[in-house]
């Protein structure tokens, strides 16, 4: 069916050259840079198509079969697919796929299971936790009496004895397990035992490792936690968004009410469509192979960096991310982040446990392998990337403001590498 109305027929290029130009520049950046930000990934063309669909037009307040608007028959179909697939992916009894983000998912759980002023125990941001787990600037740090556990100074591993001691002393309503920058596996059974000992609910935020869990390469928190939250991007390789899982029917009802109408109005149906596609992709054997490569690539990258004289927090990784301590090289995180970006490698400065530097400077960087693995990099390519990173490090030691010649040479090598593994 043709339509002469230019509102419906004009492309973005015809309608808005400025926005199209910015998008094309971002596409070129993604095509030509190696993405090592651990929380980022690259979605499939199918996910892009779903997220750019006519579902963006549809308001669908409520839940499938119980909407506050008409015309939701096919919105219901899409959301039901997303719910069924994510439940199957994580062997969960109940799922809410409407949270717009991981932060919204976490907020919904806290709204459902705790009252303002209640004590909440989460991992310290300084030790690798997330802002939404009770950091003072976040809503969770303002609404609740938020206490923080950390890691052992000797091992840099979560100090479960400290978690237990804080729980016994303060009797939190909610204990949060999860992280933003922690490279080791979590002991969900230990967390649940601690929660049960003080009558607390256990929430696991699996945002970073959801894909690893979906592939069966990490224990499934749904088997231990009262409630599990996650993002849909990162290792799960979907659109930017969130979801909540539980096996408890009463908690599920509270979560649904907390998401809508508690925190959100209408769901983003085009994003939920993208989530459904990504969940379907994650149910395949190809996805398990992908996650195995993500993990192997993290080991390969870490081995090269350690051999080159930098420290890895905890000595290595069990997952997709590496927390790099730059102090042996005499470098700072902000300095390295900027130099690597000039060289065609994107990462983020990141504090390390007990970091003496300010959060805007840091003594470390966080690296991740999901995006590079999605575009096809294997261990050989990640070893090459590690070698190039070390060259930038060494140049910075001589020229702390940046070595233009080294950065441009590395940039050319990175560009050539990316050309071998094109995206879109």
UniProtKB/Swiss-Prot annotation:
Pathway assigned to this chain's UniProt record: One-carbon metabolism; tetrahydrofolate interconversion; Amino-acid biosynthesis; glycine biosynthesis; glycine from L-serine: step 1/1
Family, similarity comment: Belongs to the SHMT family.
PROSITE patterns: SHMT
InterPro entries named among the record's database cross-references: PyrdxlP-dep_Trfase (IPR015424), PyrdxlP-dep_Trfase_major (IPR015421), PyrdxlP-dep_Trfase_small (IPR015422), Ser_HO-MeTrfase (IPR001085), Ser_HO-MeTrfase-like (IPR049943), Ser_HO-MeTrfase_PLP_BS (IPR019798), SHMT-like_dom (IPR039429)
Listed GO biological process terms: glycine biosynthetic process from serine; tetrahydrofolate interconversion
Residues with PTM N6-(pyridoxal phosphate)lysine: 234
Enzyme Commission (EC) number: 2.1.2.1
Binding site for (6S)-5,6,7,8-tetrahydrofolate: 125, 129-131, 250
Highest taxon of source: Bacteria
Location(s), subcellular: Cytoplasm
Name used for this protein in its record: Serine hydroxymethyltransferase 2
GO CC terms in record: cytosol
Cofactor(s) the record lists: pyridoxal 5'-phosphate
């Amino acid at each position: 069916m043709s339509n002469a109305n230019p509102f419906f027929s004009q492309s973005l290029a015809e309608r808005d050259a400025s926005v199209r130009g910015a998008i094309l520049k971002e596409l070129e950046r993604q095509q030509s840079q190696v993405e090592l930000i651990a929380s980022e990934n690259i979605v499939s063309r199918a996910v892009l198509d779903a997220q750019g669909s006519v579902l963006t037009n549809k308001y669908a307040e409520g839940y499938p079969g119980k909407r506050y608007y008409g015309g939701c028959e096919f919105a219901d179909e899409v959301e039901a697919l997303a719910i069924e697939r994510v439940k199957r992916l994580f062997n969960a009894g109940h799922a809410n796929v409407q949270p717009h983000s991981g932060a919204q998912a976490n907020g919904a759980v806290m709204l459902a299971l705790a009252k303002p002023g209640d004590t909440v125990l989460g991992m310290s941001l300084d030790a690798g936790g997330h802002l939404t787990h009770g950091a003072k600037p976040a809503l969770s740090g303002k609404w609740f009496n938020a206490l923080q556990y950390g890691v052992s100074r000797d091992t840099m591993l979560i100090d479960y004895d400290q978690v237990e001691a804080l729980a016994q002393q303060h009797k939190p309503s909610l204990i949060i397990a999860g992280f933003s920058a922690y490279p080791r596996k979590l002991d969900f059974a230990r967390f649940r035992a601690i929660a049960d000992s003080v009558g607390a609910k256990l929430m696991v935020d699996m945002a970073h490792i959801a894909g690893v869990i979906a592939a069966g390469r990490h224990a499934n928190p749904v088997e231990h936690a009262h409630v599990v939250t996650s993002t849909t991007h990162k290792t799960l390789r979907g659109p930017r968004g969130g979801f909540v899982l539980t096996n408890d029917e009463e908690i599920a009802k509270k979560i649904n009410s907390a998401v809508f109408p508690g925190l959100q109005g209408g769901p983003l149906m085009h994003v939920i469509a993208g989530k459904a596609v990504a969940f379907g992709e994650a149910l395949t054997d190809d996805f398990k192979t992908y996650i195995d490569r993500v993990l192997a690539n993290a080991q390969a990258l870490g081995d090269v960096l350690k051999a080159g004289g930098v420290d890895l927090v905890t000595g290595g990784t069990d997952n997709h991310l590496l927390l790099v301590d730059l102090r042996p090289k005499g470098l700072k995180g902000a300095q390295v982040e900027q130099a690597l970006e000039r060289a065609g490698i994107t990462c983020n400065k990141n504090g390390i446990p007990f970091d003496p530097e300010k959060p805007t400077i840091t003594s470390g960087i966080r690296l991740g392998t999901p995006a590079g693995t999605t575009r096809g990099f294997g261990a050989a390519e990640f070893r090459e990337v590690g070698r190039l990173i070390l060259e930038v490090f060494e140049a910075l030691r001589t020229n702390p403001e940046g070595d233009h010649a080294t950065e441009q040479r590395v940039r050319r090598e990175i560009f050539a590498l990316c050309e071998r593994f094109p995206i879109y």
